[in-house]
Each structure stands twice: as structure tokens, then as C-alpha cells.
Amino acid sequence: MSTIYEIPCVKGFIRMCNDGWLQGWHERNGGNLTYRMTGEDVAACRPYFDAEPREWVNMGVQADNLAGEYFITTGSGKFFRNVEPDPIHSIGIVEINDKGDSWRIVWGLADGARPTSEFPSHFMNHSVRKAATNGANRVIYHCHATNVIALTYILPLTDRDFSRALWQSATECPVVFPEGVGVCPWMVPGGADIAMATSEKMKTYQAAIWAQHGLFASGPDFDITFGLAHTIEKSAEIYVKVLSMGGGLIRQTITDDDLRAIAHDFGVTLNKNFLD
């Protein structure tokens, strides 16, 4: 590889940032993305690391199962629209110390930039999802998905109500996220409260919705994670359009028996708490 940008994990990270920007989910500096690197990723990127790593910064959170890991992360205050044309200032790689409570920049985030302000929240959720998936989960993605946010103004803010609405709005949804989605009430972004609330939801779900704020999605790779967010947002868009066209009247929908039939044929297990 002649540049770090040709390494698959970095190339995929940049592409996902641009995909989200093209969807319209990342106005200004909205949203953030982190990826937990494999050993092979780190080995491939190491020749491009800074000659001298920057100082350690305590996160205020701690996770034993992430000690010594490396993450690619978007930068605080950085715009997703600038990731592709200017990655060196927009994204970076951070190393976690052996106590699992501090990071230091080893590449990128040039000229004094820092990891996303939501990094502690991402970090806690990486810890939860790594444990829940036996290490398979590697991506945490937060975006301002327009129709998902719109639904948080009209639907009851419960896991059940949102999961059913999304499942019944697009046939693929019960296959893509059979466990449903979690919902968190409005909280101040970037704080410990929203990090804790989200990590509790992510023990059960691949995705959590932040009321009046956006979507938090996870997965084993960039394609699966972006696909999850895209599927949830498209289903929300369908539901918004149905409500708008019919004045709130829904004449027919995917029934609970239909959902069970989908689960049977596709070999997935639906969250029974969300079925009538």
C-alpha cells in the first residue's frame, strides 16, 4: 500500500462516512463513527502511525475488554462532508491503554483535532456489543436519520411501539433486526447519562433511537452497520408517508401472524414481547 487510505479498513471507514453524508444524515458536524480494528488492520496501518504518539487522555469511563484495542474515529467538530476530501484532519486512529480508560492519537486528527465528543459513549457501547456478540461487533455509528427523528415526536417512546411500527412498515425489517430496536428519551448529547442509557439498550439491541436526536447502530462491519441504519430509516420514512397520506388512518398492514410467518421462513427469532 502506498498510502494508509488504500488499506481496506480506512477506505471502508471513509466510504461509510461519505455514504451517510450523501443520505443527508450529517448536517454540519452531526453524527459520528468508530471502528474497532482487527490485529491485521493495526499491522497494516502501523507503518503510517506518527513517529511519536500524542499524550494519553482519560475518558472518564473504563472497559477491561477494550484494553489495548485500536479504533478509527471521526473527529470532534468535524464535518462528514469533509472526510473523503480531507481525511487527515477529519478522522484518526486512537490506541487504548492497558487499563482500558484512556486513549491517545497515533495517526490522523491533524493540527490539534480530537476524537468525537461522543467517543466515551461509543467506547462503552463497543464494550457492551463486543461482549454481547463474542467479539464480532466492530462498528458503532450515530447519524441524524430524519424520519426516525420525526417519529420520536408522535410515537410513544417505548421499544415495543417503535419496533412494531418499523417491523410493520417494511417486510425486511423483522429479518434485519428481529430483536427490535431500543428507545432512549431525550438527553443532553455527549454526557454520561446518554452513554449509560444507550449501553443498557445495546445489551439487547443492535440499534437504539435517541428521541429528538437520531439513531445509534452497531454491527460487525461497515456494510452491515450502514445497512441496518439505512433499513431503519427507510422503514421510518414509509411510516411517515403513510401517516401523512392517510391522515393517520392505516387500512392494512403486516399482521402479527405475517411477522411470525416471515420469522419462520427466514429462520429468525422475533422478540415475543413485541408481538400480540
Q: What are these regions, as identified by a protein language model?
A:
Residues 1-276:
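Glycine-rich flexible loops
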